[in-house]
Amino acid sequence: NELWSEDQDAWMASPYAPMGMAIPTEGGYILNGRWSFSSGTDHCNWLVIGALVGDADGKPAMPFQSLHVMVPRPDYTIIEDSWNVVGLQGTGSKDVVVEGAFIPDYRAIDAAKVMDGTAYKESGRDEALYRMPWTAVFPSAISAAVLGICEGALRTAIEYQKDRAGMLGKTSDDPYMMAAIGEASAEIRSSRAT
């Protein structure tokens, strides 16, 4: 409720790897860490991040336990100029840092329960969406963007080839070009259908 009760269109970034340490304290955890690859983070008011449960010395507790933690914007810092990768500037990925933020228990959940689809029991939600294992949901979220990129690239290629001339005439009349465009289109459509 906290995340979407006031703004149903609230966005969150998710540098998911458990790069931080969550030290148990009364009513929750004290969270510290630095996460890389937080795509789109400038546009988000929340993070969903991974953290290891730590002991009082800040070392991973045994047995090993990982959490998924929700962190509101005032509790993290975006590190500007931390993403300098050729061809991926548009992702808006940056590092984020959390230093000593208190995370109430209700904003953390055992990552193993999310992975196996049993986290819904603690959330009080019983709809099918909440019973799905993370491994069934996450790939769809990532592949949707990739399919969109592929469709955009195909449209651009078709537009570019439309009036382009090659050694043997218009490339739009070239059977090899038509075959390549057709194959790309079929691959994209079949990916969307699965």
Which positions does each model-derived feature cover?
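Beta-strand-enriched cores of mature, soluble protein domains
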Residues: G27-Y29, D55, Q89
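C-terminal helix-coil-helix/basic helical segment that borders enzyme active sites and/or dimer interfaces
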Residues: R192-T194
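Glycine-rich flavin
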Residues: N1-C44, A61
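A generic structural signal for well-ordered coil/turn residues at beta-strand boundaries
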Residues: P18, H43, Q65, G90-V97
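Glycine-rich beta->alpha junctions and the first turn(s) of the following alpha-helix
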Residues: V86, S93-I188
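DPxDG-like acidic metal-binding loop motif
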Residues: R34-T77
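Active-site glycine-rich loop that binds ribose-phosphate moieties when present
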Residues: S14-Y16, A51, V71-V85, G90
